[in-house]
Each structure stands twice: as C-alpha cells, then as structure tokens.
Design a protein with these regions (language model features):
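A short acidic, Gly/Pro-enriched loop at the edge of an enzyme's catalytic core
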Residues: 88-99
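Conserved Class I SAM-dependent methyltransferase catalytic core
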Residues: 8, 129-187
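Conserved SAM-binding motif I beta-strand of class I
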Residues: 55-60
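Residue-level signal for inorganic ion chemistry
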Residues: 16-19, 102, 135, 149
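Conserved acidic residues
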Residues: 32, 97, 147
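SAM-dependent Rossmann-like transferase core, predominantly class I methyltransferases
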Residues: 1-51, 62-68, 89-90, 189-218
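Conserved SAM-binding strand-loop segment of SAM-dependent methyltransferases
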Residues: 77-87
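Mobile active-site "lid"/loop adjacent to the S-adenosyl-L-methionine
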Residues: 103-131
Length: 218
C-alpha cells in the first residue's frame, strides 16, 4: 500500500514502531476517542484505526505534515480527522480515551525550538524536555476518566522527570516499553555535543527509547 513520506515530514522511525507496539497492547473500544499528537506522516493515527478505533484525531504544527497525513488517510481509505496547530491547542475542551504522543525530545545546542524546517520534529531545547513537559502538563485535562496517555521518548532527556511530572498532574504513570536502538542520523551528527555534555559515553552508538503509560484513574 502506498504511504507518503515526503522530505520535511517525520517518517516512521524506531520510536514510532515502539509506540505502535504499546498501542497494540491497549484494548480499544470502537467508540474510543484517540488523539495522535505530532502525527507527522500519520502512521500512528492510521495504526489506531487499524487497531479498532473509529474516532481518531491527529494534530501537527507543520502544514506539510498535516497535508501528508490527510493524503495517507485517503490512500488507506481510513477515517481520520487531521488538524493543524501546536500540540494540544487544537483540541482544547475535548476528551479522549487514548492519547498517543511522539514529540520532539532530542537535546539541542539551541534553547529555543526551531520555528520551521525538519528539525522541528526532533529538536527540543537544551534538555530535550521543552515539548515533553508541555504534554505532561496539558494531556491530563484531555483524558477521559480511565483514559490512557502513551508517550515515547529517549532516555537521554530523562525518564524519571517524565514520570514525576505526570504523577504530579494526577496520573498513574509507569514505563510500559523499553528498547535500545542504534543512533539515527540526528544523534550520530550530534554525538560529540551529547558526549561533551555527559549525556552519552564516549563512543556510545545506541540510545534507549521508553514508552511511558499514564492513566487517569479518576
């Protein structure tokens, strides 16, 4: 089946695969409302429909990503609502049984987030947590009672801070999946910088990805 992955749009990677695996473990009702934050090419939103959800909303700040996700949904003949906007802003006031998030999380020399270009899909400030922390603060209000947040990121930007912030927001959070994968092009190009900051060991060539599962129990 044709799946579009144009330049400048985040294509499915190892983190996408790990999050899709965690998604596959979630029992979804047909009427479940699912949100895919930072959808990129739409791969995870499409996976949610294939997993049984019939009400899937995907969000991305990039116009190119939004158009790509819409085209991929049309090519797959699967019903997905795709909205353009920053993170959770387009769906304020709505509730979801499942939120999927694969945000930018790579530590970068620049403190500010890039405003355009492909790097918006991975650069996340000096500590890699600028976008992660916004999701940790904002996602709980969008979860229906019993709703679940599945959030994937690299251990380079800290697993415990994510768990702590989600728990502080009233969610029950734990690590659901872990996987070590070889550095991709971005981390290979940034290895010297990460090594200089003590985030990786000299000569290290793999990173650990984690999926955090957080549930709104009340």
């Amino acid at each position: 089946m044709l799946f579009l992955k144009p330049p400048g749009v985040y294509s499915p990677q190892g983190d996408t695969s790990l999050l899709a695996e965690a998604l596959g473990h979630e029992p979804l009702q047909v009427a479940a409302r699912v949100l895919d934050v930072g959808t990129g090419s739409g791969a995870l939103a499409l996976a949610a429909v294939r997993h049984g959800a019939s009400r899937v909303t995907a969000v991305d700040v990039s116009l190119r990503a939004v158009l790509t996700a819409r085209l991929n949904a049309r090519l797959s003949r699967l019903p997905i609502e795709v909205l353009r906007g920053s993170l959770l802003d387009p769906v304020r006031g709505r509730r979801f049984e499942l939120i999927l998030a694969n945000p930018p999380y790579v530590p970068a020399p620049q403190v500010r987030l890039p405003r355009r270009g492909a790097a918006r899909a991975w650069d996340a400030g000096h500590d890699g947590r600028v976008v992660l922390d916004r999701i940790c603060r904002g996602a709980p209000a969008l979860l229906a009672p019993g709703g679940v947040l599945l959030l994937v990121h690299s251990a380079l930007c800290g697993v415990e801070p994510t768990l702590d912030r989600l728990r502080e927001s009233g969610l029950d959070a734990e690590v659901a999946e872990r996987r070590r994968i070889p550095f991709g092009p971005v981390l290979r190009a940034r290895a010297a910088y990460l090594e200089g900051r003590g985030l990786i060991r000299p000569g290290e060539e793999k990173e650990e990805l984690v999926v955090i599962r957080a549930i709104r129990s009340r």
